[in-house]
Structures are given as C-alpha cells and as structure tokens.
Amino acid sequence: MEPERLKFGGPRELCGAADLISQFKLVQHHEFFCKKSLPVSLSDSHYLHNVVGDTEIRKGEGMQLDQLIESISQSRETNIRIQPFDIDELQESFQLNDMTPVELPPAEKGAPTIPSKSKSESKDRDRKHKKHKDRDKDKDREHKKHKHKHKDRSKDKDKDKDRDRKKDKNGHHDSGDHSKKHHDKKRKHDGDEDLNDVQRHKKNKHKSSKLDEVGAIRVAG
C-alpha cells in the first residue's frame, strides 16, 4: 500500500499544501536563505518593518540606505561620474569591414517577402470598403422602397380598375332596368291612350245616335 506521505504529490504541511521544498530537495537552500538570521543592519531598517511587520524587528527612524550597503565607505571614496563613450575606442572594439555583397544561388533564396502595408493604408482601405458597403445598403434600401411603392401603386390601380368594372357593370344593369321601366311605362301610357280613344269613340257614337233620334222625333212632329 502506498504510504501517506507519497500520496497526492508527496508529504503535506499542516495547511494541506504539498511540501514542495522536501519534494524537490530544496531543504539546504531554504535553510541557507530563509532560516538564516538577518544581519543587524537589515533588521534595524525601517523598510523591513513596513513590509514584514513588528516580528523581531526593532523600530527605526526611517529607511537608511547605508544599512543595506556593506561597503558604503568604499563607494563614497570612489569618484562616480558619467562619461560619454569614446568613438575611437568603440571603433577599435567593433571593427566594421567593408565586404562585397553576397550573391546566393536561386535554390538557396527564400520566397520574396511582400512588404506589409502600413496601418494607415489598411485603415483607409477598411474605411473605403465600409463606405461602399453602406452605399450598397442604401441603394438596396431605396430599391426595395421603390419596388414596394410600385407594388402598392399597381395594387391601387388594380383596385381602381375593379371598382370601375363593377361600376360599369352596375351602370349597364341600371340602364337596362331603366329602359325596361321606360318601355313598360310607355306601353302603359299607350294602353291608356287606346282605352281613352275607345271610350271617346263610344261617347261620340252614343251622342250621334241620340242626335239622330231627336231629329227623327222632330220630323215626325
């Protein structure tokens, strides 16, 4: 059975994390760098007090750089100044020889590199492409709108034609009815006139017969 310390990547600490120091054999380095007591010059610095805390560090009056530098006396004695580079020394250090241009055979030459376009050119191209795209969209929108209007206009024309056709049909039907009514009225009027003529003829005949009778009586008397 596998021992507990070798499970899950090796032995674990109290917090549950793996003991990487023992696993990677860093105990000696850990003892040398981490467990070694700090020098007095470092432990007295106010910088460590601000970073680490009050643990075994006496409070200082502020961070002092001379406590962190052991050879501060030597650094003060040396004359520190910035000097510019000497061109002659640089030329002696880096000798540049003029050489003839190297001609490679075609087999060893690589593919020619196409110079990449600058960002401004690519932006201009993208902007132009976007403008053309927007213009095409506007054209398509106008075309659709015009097509829709033309379709609505044709629908209205068809509706007007159907309305006129129905109107003409109704007008023709009404004219037929009107002519029929007029014809019936005329026939009725003609019939009434004929009836009046017959009655008038009868009255005249009856009147003439009466006159004949009166004349005959007068002659006889």
Swiss-Prot record:
Region of interest (Disordered), residue spans: 101-221
Protein location: Nucleus
Compositional bias annotation for Basic and acidic residues: 153-178
Biased composition (Basic residues): 142-152, 179-188
GO BP annotations, alphabetical order: regulation of transcription by RNA polymerase II
Stored InterPro entries: Mediator_Med19_met
The UniProt record lists the keyword Transcription regulation: yes
Key words of the record: Nucleus, Transcription, Transcription regulation
GO molecular function terms attached to this record: transcription coregulator activity
Gene Ontology cellular component terms for the protein in this record: mediator complex
Cystine residue pairs: none
Family: Belongs to the plant Mediator complex subunit 19 family.
Complex and partners: Component of the Mediator complex. Interacts with FIB2.
Function field: Component of the Mediator complex, a coactivator involved in the regulated transcription of nearly all RNA polymerase II-dependent genes. Mediator functions as a bridge to convey information from gene-specific regulatory proteins to the basal RNA polymerase II transcription machinery. The Mediator complex, having a compact conformation in its free form, is recruited to promoters by direct interactions with regulatory proteins and serves for the assembly of a functional preinitiation complex with RNA polymerase II and the general transcription factors.
Protein name in UniProt: Mediator of RNA polymerase II transcription subunit 19a
The gene coding this protein: MED19A
